[in-house]
UniProtKB/Swiss-Prot annotation:
PANTHER family given in the database record: PROTEIN FAM181A, PROTEIN FAM181B
Family: Belongs to the FAM181 family.
Tree of life domain: Eukaryota
Organism of provenance: Homo sapiens (Human)
Positions with biased composition (Basic and acidic residues): 1-14, 129-142
Name of the protein this chain belongs to: Protein FAM181A
Region: Disordered, residue numbers: 1-35, 117-160, 172-193
Gene Ontology terms: cellular component: cytoplasm
InterPro entries membership: FAM181, TEADIR3_omega_loop
Any one Pfam family match given in the protein's UniProt record, by short name: TEADIR3
């Protein structure tokens, strides 16, 4: 039914029971019916109403169109979304960071750090080796100070132990390439032919004072009698055999200088070594009673046997005290021929004390 026909029928129904109404009231009632149109599309028809009828309608009774409502809702939605996005957006980064360059720097730094360490010990550096060498010196000094019974005895020997030129020279030669090329000096990193090794590495160890024993038991042809120009250590003559029972390590025996005994051959000195305690791998060996074991078939091999020397072999080392028949044997310490360099490489030094 068209809108005009419905409106005219409504006017007829209102005019039938109440004829005393004014014309303005009838139009207001019809406007109420038009504004409460239930079906869709009424807004479109409402816009096409005559202008004269629109002007006569009051303001609160006119509803906004659906397009206006949709436009308003769309605006509110966009505004709220823009505000929410503005609030959620983080602040711009003030400093631009090149993450790839940063990671490359970190990798380079850590690769250089770990390439200087030995492969077997990732947590240890080469510095503990140098510290260990400095800690060993006071221990050896205390070991050497132990057997001295008299306050002024053995002063010259202590100075010689501290001032060992061969040991200091080897230590200086080994530390020099480590400072110049720290990466090349570590074992397992660079091939042997490319390492910066000292010249003494390729030679046999040659201690300052060594004995070259021939078949006859005498000194070799290229070495003369040792320690001719050196003075004897003072205060070692009155030492008795009770001072020889102090256990000493082979390293301390190797570092102590041998005594000067004129007129005694090397065989006598070697045999005399068997009467002194010799500690091997922490097991001290003390001299037993004379003549307890049978005599060795080769007298010059007294160095390698653990049995004590015999009276015939030690006759030239003992002297009478005041002619009473009491004999006092002097302690004799010989320096063994070393089979390896005095300063081992750092990797073996670390494993050797575990």
């Amino acid at each position: 039914m068209p809108l005009e026909e419905r409106r005219s029928s409504g006017e007829r129904n209102d005019a039938a029971p109440t004829n005393h109404r004014r014309p303005g009231e009838k139009r207001a009632s019809t406007a109420k019916q038009v504004s409460s149109v239930p079906f869709l599309g009424a807004a479109g028809h409402q816009q096409s109403l005559p202008s004269s009828w629109k002007a006569s309608c009051s303001g609160p009774l006119v509803m906004a169109s659906d397009s206006d409502v949709k436009m308003l809702l769309n605006f509110v939605n966009l505004a709220s979304s823009d505000i929410k996005a503005a609030l959620d957006k983080s602040a711009p980064c003030r400093r631009s960071v090149d993450h790839r360059k940063y990671l490359q720097k970190q990798l380079k730094r850590f690769s250089q750090k770990y390439s200087r360490l030995p492969r077997g010990l990732p947590g240890r550096a080469a510095e503990p080796y140098l510290k260990r060498g400095s800690e060993d010196r006071p221990r050896r000094l205390l070991l050497d100070l132990g057997p001295d019974s008299s306050p002024g005895g053995g002063g010259g020997c202590k100075e010689k132990v501290l001032r060992n030129p061969y040991r200091e020279e080897c230590l200086a030669k080994e530390q020099l390439p480590q400072r110049q090329h720290p990466e090349a000096a570590q074992p397992g990193q660079v091939p042997m032919r490319k390492r910066q090794l000292p010249a003494s590495f390729w030679e046999e160890p040659r201690p300052t004072h060594s004995y070259h024993v021939g078949l006859e038991g005498g000194l070799g042809p290229r070495e003369g009698p040792p320690y001719e120009g050196k003075k004897n250590c003072k205060g070692l003559e009155p030492l008795g055999p009770e001072t020889t029972l102090v256990s000493m390590s082979p390293r301390a025996l190797a570092e102590k200088e041998p005594l000067k005994m004129p007129g005694v051959s090397l065989v006598g000195r070697v045999n005399a070594w068997s009467c002194c305690p010799f500690q091997y791998h922490g097991q001290p060996i003390y001299p037993g009673p004379l003549g307890a074991l049978p005599q060795s078939p080769v007298p010059s091999l007294g160095l390698w046997r653990k049995s004590p020397a015999f009276p015939g072999e030690l006759a030239h080392l003992c002297k009478d005290v005041d002619g009473l028949g009491q004999k006092v044997c002097r302690p004799v310490v010989l320096k063994p021929i070393p089979t390896k360099p005095a300063v081992p490489p750092p990797i073996f030094n670390v494993f050797g004390y575990l």
